[in-house]
Amino acid sequence: MTKPTTEQPTTVKCPTCQSAVIWNAESPFRPFCSKKCQMIDFGEWADEEKSIPGAPDMSDSDGWSEDQY
């Protein structure tokens, strides 16, 4: 005989408003709680308020050119 499972659903915090979001197929905007929070986050990336750290871009002032290769 098996015991009935009473597992709690996996939840995550909405990256924008920190509300709890159940992680399943019925949460269409996951990890966001709503379309509004999803669009706020998208706008922050588009305005470059958020970024992924990395090496700085090379520019012409760095002495780089295609002729060196």
From Swiss-Prot:
Highest taxon in the source lineage: Bacteria
Start-end of Acidic residues biased regions: 59-69
One GO term (biological process): regulation of DNA-templated transcription
Required cofactor(s): Zn(2+)
One Pfam entry name: YacG
Tagged with keyword Zinc: yes
SUPFAM superfamilies, per database record: Glucocorticoid receptor-like (DNA-binding domain) (SSF57716)
Signal peptide stretch: none
Binding-site residues, Zn(2+): C14, C17, C33, C37
InterPro entries (alphabetical): DNA_gyrase_inhibitor_YacG, Znf_NHR/GATA
Cofactor binding notes: Binds 1 zinc ion.
Keywords from the UniProt entry: Metal-binding, Zinc
Chain spans, region Disordered: 46-69
GO MF annotation terms: DNA topoisomerase type II (double strand cut, ATP-hydrolyzing) inhibitor activity; zinc ion binding
Coiled-coil blocks: none
Subunit comment: Interacts with GyrB.
HAMAP family cross-referenced by the UniProt entry: DNA_gyrase_inhibitor_YacG
Family under the similarity heading: Belongs to the DNA gyrase inhibitor YacG family.
Role this protein plays: Inhibits all the catalytic activities of DNA gyrase by preventing its interaction with DNA. Acts by binding directly to the C-terminal domain of GyrB, which probably disrupts DNA binding by the gyrase.
Name assigned to this protein: DNA gyrase inhibitor YacG
Organism (species): Aliivibrio fischeri (strain ATCC 700601 / ES114)
Upper taxonomic lineage: Bacteria, Pseudomonadati, Pseudomonadota, Gammaproteobacteria, Vibrionales
